[in-house]
């Protein structure tokens, strides 16, 4: 994995591009209109509408800059390479057995921007992903870098 890259699935990339387009094409023009309307009210020193619109404009511009920075450093998770892999890699869905809790869990390894623990989508930067990355079915490893380390076994690898 390359450092300083934002790993995204094709779906994640499309979502970010759509958000950026919406911010630039819809939200930015709307806030500019609100600012103009607030300016037309006169004295800006005590104009709450102007202050609120200015704050909202700052949030929009910050998010636009964030997305542009993400897209400038994006690396797509290559679906065709993931399919061919027989080991855990970005995009893999992995079934593990946790020896400490005696449970089976499935996780998909995605870039940090798409991680969602509730959906069992874990960041490639997480301790679990670090422990299992590059490993094969039946490999056992220790998950460290957390308060209570634990041992897991890779039961199954599903590469899209």
Swiss-Prot record:
PROSITE patterns listed in its UniProt record: GREAB_1, GREAB_2
One Pfam family named in its UniProt record: GreA_GreB_N
The entry's keywords: Coiled coil, DNA-binding, Transcription, Transcription regulation
Known function: Necessary for efficient RNA polymerase transcription elongation past template-encoded arresting sites. The arresting sites in DNA have the property of trapping a certain fraction of elongating RNA polymerases that pass through, resulting in locked ternary complexes. Cleavage of the nascent transcript by cleavage factors such as GreA or GreB allows the resumption of elongation from the new 3'terminus. GreA releases sequences of 2 to 3 nucleotides.
GO MF term list: DNA binding; RNA polymerase binding
Domain of life, per lineage: Bacteria
UniProt keyword Transcription regulation present: yes
Family membership: Belongs to the GreA/GreB family.
InterPro entries referenced in this protein's UniProt entry, alphabetically: GreA/GreB_C_sf, TF_GreA/GreB_CS, Tscrpt_elong_fac_GreA, Tscrpt_elong_fac_GreA/B, Tscrpt_elong_fac_GreA/B_C, Tscrpt_elong_fac_GreA/B_fam, Tscrpt_elong_fac_GreA/B_N, Tscrpt_elong_fac_GreA/B_N_sf
Any coiled-coil regions, as ranges: 8-28
Keyword Signal: no
A biological process term (GO) from this entry: DNA-templated transcription elongation
Protein name in the entry: Transcription elongation factor GreA
